Regions:
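Catalytic domains of carbohydrate-active enzymes, especially glycoside hydrolases
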Residues: 46-66, 181-188, 244-247
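A contiguous, low-structure linker/loop signature
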Residues: 70-107, 130
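Short active-site-adjacent helix-start/loop capping segments
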Residues: 29-31, 62-64, 71-83, 143-144
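Active-site loop segments of alpha/beta catalytic cores
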Residues: 1-29, 36-37, 106-336
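Acidic/polar N-terminal loop/beta-strand segments that form early-domain functional surfaces
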Residues: 23-26, 49, 65-70
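Surface-exposed strand-loop-strand hairpins of Gram-negative outer-membrane beta-barrel proteins
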Residues: 34-45
Length: 336
């Protein structure tokens, strides 16, 4: 469905009340008759899980595909484990040494399971017609780190800079084409997950992440296609570089103070965050409600803040805790 996303964003910022967009695809899968593994191998089943999440939480401002971030690495040849009701995980890196980068082939943007996620967007837009639909994919440095293995990639940015740039370049080339594929089939935007960049220093993040993210944003973002950049690391000192990518939405994890982040991020973009998935898993509804109320109070003066989780929520999280989060939001909105 074609939506002017600049208007969508502006309406959220100008609204009196606060909105919410938690990343909770996986806990909503049990609302269908399918397992997690079934939904990430079948676009129609994934779309039904997306619709189930909207039916369960009807005020969410958008719908998202499953945050299966193994998809991109799998396209490059990684071995992926698929538990029946857990998030897929990369078991083995594709390359182990920097000198292997030159021979690494960039896969077609429709290889692996990519088209399942494209099918999910197409099918979801038949079921969800009143709000945007977002696809999900990794960011360039995070994909590069998955391909090489994180600890080796973190060393390579120091000891093998040329090869690491070549690897991030190949990741970016693939991710641009994948983002274009989402845009071509009618998605309203992407959730670009770049968590591994949060481990880098601000200088290294600018060199190995921000400039490549900007290329993805420049290739696809316009008034009808919206990029939300996610980094759940300790990125308080990286906000200028993140904003410089040109993305129009920024999603933060619980490693940062959202009051500080909202102050640093200009109010012409949306800022999402940041209840910890671990807390949503381990704590009860009363605690979650209190934590949400505290977060909302901390961000009260920032109209560009959107309540969310700090990252994707594991399948085991009880939906009663999401209910508690929304209950706190509804009570807060009565005071604004």
């Amino acid at each position: 469905m074609r939506i002017n996303m600049d208007n969508w964003s502006r309406e959220i910022i100008e609204a009196k009340d606060r909105r919410y967009l938690p990343v909770l695809y996986f806990p909503c899968v049990p609302l269908t008759e399918y397992t997690v593994a079934e939904t990430i191998h079948d676009g129609k089943k994934m779309a039904q899980a997306m619709k189930a999440s909207i039916d369960r939480f009807p005020e969410m401002i958008g719908a998202m595909t499953g945050m299966d971030l193994a998809v991109d690495t799998e396209c490059f040849g990684a071995k992926v484990r698929f538990p029946e009701n857990a998030v897929p995980a990369v078991e083995h890196a594709v390359i182990e040494k920097a000198d292997e980068v030159a021979d690494l082939q960039v896969p077609d943007a429709h290889s692996g399971r990519v088209d399942i996620f494209l099918d999910a967007v197409v099918e979801a837009e038949k079921l969800i017609t009143d709000r945007p639909t977002f696809g999900g994919q990794l960011g360039p440095f995070s994909l590069a780190a998955n391909i090489m293995q994180m600890d080796k990639a973190m060393m390579a940015v120091i000891t093998n800079k040329a090869e690491m740039h070549q690897l991030v370049e190949k990741a970016t080339e693939f991710l641009i084409e994948r983002a274009k594929a989402y845009k071509e089939i009618g998605a309203n935007g992407i959730f670009l997950a770049e968590p591994t960049a949060g481990i880098l220093s601000p200088k290294m993040a600018a060199e190995f992440s921000d400039q490549y993210v900007k290329r993805i944003v420049d290739a696809v973002q316009d008034e009808y296609f919206y990029v939300i950049l996610h980094d759940c690391g300790s990125v308080t000192k990286m906000t200028e570089g993140m904003y410089g990518t040109g993305a129009k939405g920024f999603h933060f994890g619980n490693a940062v103070d959202m009051g500080v982040i909202c102050e640093k991020m200009p109010q012409d973009v949306l800022v999402f965050g940041n209840l910890a998935p671990a807390d949503l898993y381990s704590k009860g509804p009363d605690e979650i409600k209190a934590m949400t109320a505290e977060l909302l109070e901390k961000t009260r003066q920032y109209p560009h803040f959107v309540l969310s989780t700090g990252c994707d929520v594991p399948p085991e999280v009880k939906l009663e805790n999401i209910d508690a989060m929304i209950e706190a939001l509804n009570e807060f909105n009565q005071t604004v």
